[in-house]
Curated annotation (Swiss-Prot):
It is found in: Cell inner membrane. Its main location: membrane. The gene is atpD2. It holds the Pfam family ATP-synt_VA_C. Produces ATP from ADP in the presence of a proton gradient across the membrane. The catalytic sites are hosted primarily by the beta subunits. This is ATP synthase subunit beta 2. The lineage of its organism: Bacteria, Pseudomonadati, Pseudomonadota, Betaproteobacteria, Burkholderiales. Residues 494-505 have a biased composition (Basic and acidic residues). Residues 1-30, 494-534 are annotated as: Disordered. Its EC number is 7.1.2.2. Belongs to the ATPase alpha/beta chains family. SMART domains: AAA. Residues 1-10 have a biased composition (Polar residues).
Amino acid sequence: MADPQATNGTGAACAERDASDVGDVSDVGDARDEGAGRVVAVRGAVVDVAFDGGALPALNEALTIPVDGAAPILAEVHAHLSDAAVRALALGPTGGLRRGAAVRATGGPIRVPVGDAVLGRLLSVTGAPGDDGAALAADVERRPIHRGAPPLAEQKSANALFATGIKVIDLLAPLAQGGKAAMFGGAGVGKTVLVMELIHAMVERYRGISVFAGIGERSREGHEMLLDMRGSGVLGRTVLVYGQMNEPPGARWRVPLTALAIAEYFRDERAQNVLLLMDNVFRFVQAGAEVSGLLGRLPSRVGYQPTLASEVAALQERIASVEGAAVTAIEAVYVPADDFTDPAVTAIAAHVDSMVVLSRAMAAEGMYPAIDPVASSSILLDPLVVGEAHVEVAIEVRRVIEHYRELQDVIALLGIDELGADDRRLVGRARRLQRFLTQPFAVTEAFTGQAGASVEIADTIAGCRAILRGDCDDWRESSLYMVGTLDDARRKEAAAREADARREAAAAASGAGPGTTSDPASGSAEPQGARHGR
């Protein structure tokens, strides 16, 4: 597929050429002689270059600009200004760059290292190592970051479930192996933790390759993720590609393409399943808006670039599966000001198979993962894909929780006792379902002290069906909170009842009468803010 810049005449997908590799910007010795130029203007990250030879570099071709006392600057051509000049976007800081500096065209787009050599490594947008490991070998295989999607005849549709072991996702918003899923949420609701748990699930369940693209996020978060992956043992089958928020917009804008090039290699050349994770796709759109402004284009709605739809489509359409190997994409999407009608959010949502919506209200109640069971959805929730039993339970769970939300205003004003018997019963089951759909994560075990739980889809369906049937109506709500299967909750309930019995026996023996215990229907250990009427 063509690069999104092709839609407005300022860029196009550059054809893959048999030219020198461009990943480590210091490796430019075989740049073509006729590609020599000079800098004629520098405006922040925008660099105008004149070429006296008359042969201009193609759009999206990489340029290298030596800088005295520093590493060469890598730039990418985005516009032809005249028959002898181009406008390029620097992918690194332009400090120290001056007019008249020599420029070399490399003869092709940016090329990044791929293969086993990059597993367990942290790379920049150009493929340069950013960790404390050894330098990559000079003969490592490289691929261009600009490529088209596989032909339609070679693409394979996503119709198999990607079981995550996360109850609320597998039940209500199942992911497709070889499909695209997006996790939408505002700041601080748990998107990154959810992405890390899915990396853990992929390594444990599928033994595949994970490629993580950190787009415009905090350097601290990137460092923490690197350390966490080392500690959990998943780094050896993962590639990290970072373009952090302190980097120029061009670097942040191209990071997803670098990650895609690596994922495509393992899909095409090794026939391996790949889990592609991107955090955060909104920052990709944001970087594109910055680039658009730097190149002088008029903004569109809410200040976004006029090419928003085509840029998002060009990225998403490259995420495709072929016969024998699947690329499963899971994307975290920041929702600015919790506004789900934002143009960037709606543009991304149009391309995904599963929408996992994280709720600030559920996070405030301590319901983690804070996934909204009503707003989340998936095209795979179909009897022909997941089966009749799965769909029936999912629909009923969603109906019960939605009806409970409709009753919350009445409960807040009049109290739960003013509801009819059927509504009180439904409220109790809805609250138990909400707590049963919480779950401890393996990646948070070091902080919570609670072992992570991965639950099979059949166990999730069986547990929800039992709650809907009323089998747990006399259980404490706290017994269902942060457990794996219903058997785990049953053991927790039995232990709580046994503890209550011991306390009552001790109180009776001391002559103080029966002890005051928590309401067995609600429990006393539920999360803060999870009482009736919130």
